[in-house]
Structures are given as C-alpha cells and as structure tokens.
Amino acid sequence: MPSTEFSHIELSFGSFDALRAVHFARRFPPHFHDTFAIGVVEEGSCVIRTRRGEWMARPGSVLAFSPGEVHAAIPCDEQGYTYRMIYPSVEAMQELGGAFRGVFAFCAPVIDDERLSGPLREAQVPLMGEGAAVYAESLFVAALRQLGGFRVPADRRAERAAADARIVAIAHEHMAARLSDSVKLDDVAALCGVSPFHLIRIFHRAVGVTPIAYCIQLRVLRAQAMLAEGSAVADAAYACGFSDQSHLTRAFRDVVGVPPGRYLRSVQHRA
C-alpha cells in the first residue's frame, strides 16, 4: 500500500525532518530544498535528473543533494519506489566538522556504494522510530562523515559564471523579500539589468528552473517553515502569496512530497 510518512529527529547536533515513502509512484518535478537531502532507496527504482545529468537509482543507491540543488525524480514503473530521506540543515551538517564546511556538491546525486548505503540505512531506521535509538545517533554521524568523502569542492565543479551568480543573488533577494506579494518577471529582470528572456536563460543555466518556478519554491519553503512553527495551512498560504489553500497544496506536494495538512499533523504529533 503506498504511503508517505514524515517524522522529526532531534539529535545533539541539530533537529530536522525525515521522510519514508513506500511505493511512491508520483513524478517529482524539478525542485530544491534549503537543507541537505540525504537518503537511501529501499525498493524499486527511479531516474534522478539534475542540471549535471541523469542517474538511475536502484535498491541500495544513496541519494545526496546539497541545499539549493534542483533535482527531479521519475519512477521507472507504476509500482513506484520506496525510499527514506533525512533533511539536515546546513548548520547541523557543519557541526560535524571539516568535511561539511564551505560550499560544495556531492560527486553525484546518486551514489552506489554498499559501504555507505548499508550504514546509512541502518542508522535511519531507528532514527525514524522503528527500533531502539540508543546507538542511532552515532551510527548516523558515522554514516554522514563517510558521505563527506564523496563531496566535490566548489572550485572543481562547473560553477555558474560570476556575472550569473550576481544576477541570481539579486533576483533571489528581491523575491525572498516579497513572497507574500505578486512577483513579476519584468520587474525582477529590470532590477537585475537584463531582459526577461536573458533572466530566464541565466536561471536555467545556473539554477535549473525559471525565475518564477524558483519563486514558487521559495514560497513553499517559507510555508513549510511556518507550518513547522504551528501556523494553520490557510494562514501559511495567504502569508506566502498563494492564491488559495489548494494552490499551496499542489505546490507543496511537488517540493515536500506530502500535502501541507499532513505535514502539519506530523508537526503537531511531535509537539
């Protein structure tokens, strides 16, 4: 039976969300998180797409995304795939030390290495409340530190050009400050000193989505933060610039994987 369950993890170096999806058969459109997203595929398979390329994720594959990395996931068949994900913040990962300091990406969003996937899954099961959690944190920390060996320093990646980075930063700051308002592409482009068409090209090249799609995902992440603090779904929708609750629900599922109401219930359950 397909199911998707959120839980919350409290560890000595931070607190963060965790997700287990069983027979997830829905296509994830391109999206990003403002946290790391790290997990393991347990059953089935899917195709992972990022601006770096395309990968096949199978049972035992580790999924690893840096904050802001746009990615899409497509199930390979109607049975879907079963996976676990944990979403540690940048601050939480930096508490682990050297391997996670500075700007970097993982060598690939899909890593096939049993030495990594075994310990990571062994740690995730008790962390998500399915077994004794006495030793879970040490297992998880050891697995994450091992994952640090698969990172690629920023200067070894095909990074966006300096001019593109400046334009994206200006656009991000403008949109992030106006999530409750109507954001128009022409206004953002004018602020950045480029044409709307050029701005779209820059965002596709540097980020992987259009400026408006990027803005919608910023709104979803803000709504998610509001729900985590106990706000009602309708209040979060209004405050984050969605036309109504159903508009938020559609966008929220595309980024988070579950409807906002279910996410809110998971927050209330752990309170």
Predicted features and spans:
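Short, Lys/Arg-enriched, Trp-marked, Pro/Gly-tolerant hinge/linker segments that flank
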Residues: R101-S117, R121, V125-C192, R205-Q217
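Short helix-to-turn junction characteristic of helix-turn-helix DNA-binding domains
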Residues: V41, M175-L179, M226-G230
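N-terminal regulatory/effector-sensing and dimerization cores
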Residues: P2-F104
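N-terminal intrinsically disordered/low-complexity leader segments
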Residues: M1-P2, A154-A158, Q268-H269
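C-terminal regulatory/oligomerization modules of transcriptional regulators
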Residues: A142, R270-A271
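Basic/polar phosphate-binding segments, predominantly the helix-turn-helix DNA-binding elements
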Residues: E173-A176, D181-L218, A237-S266
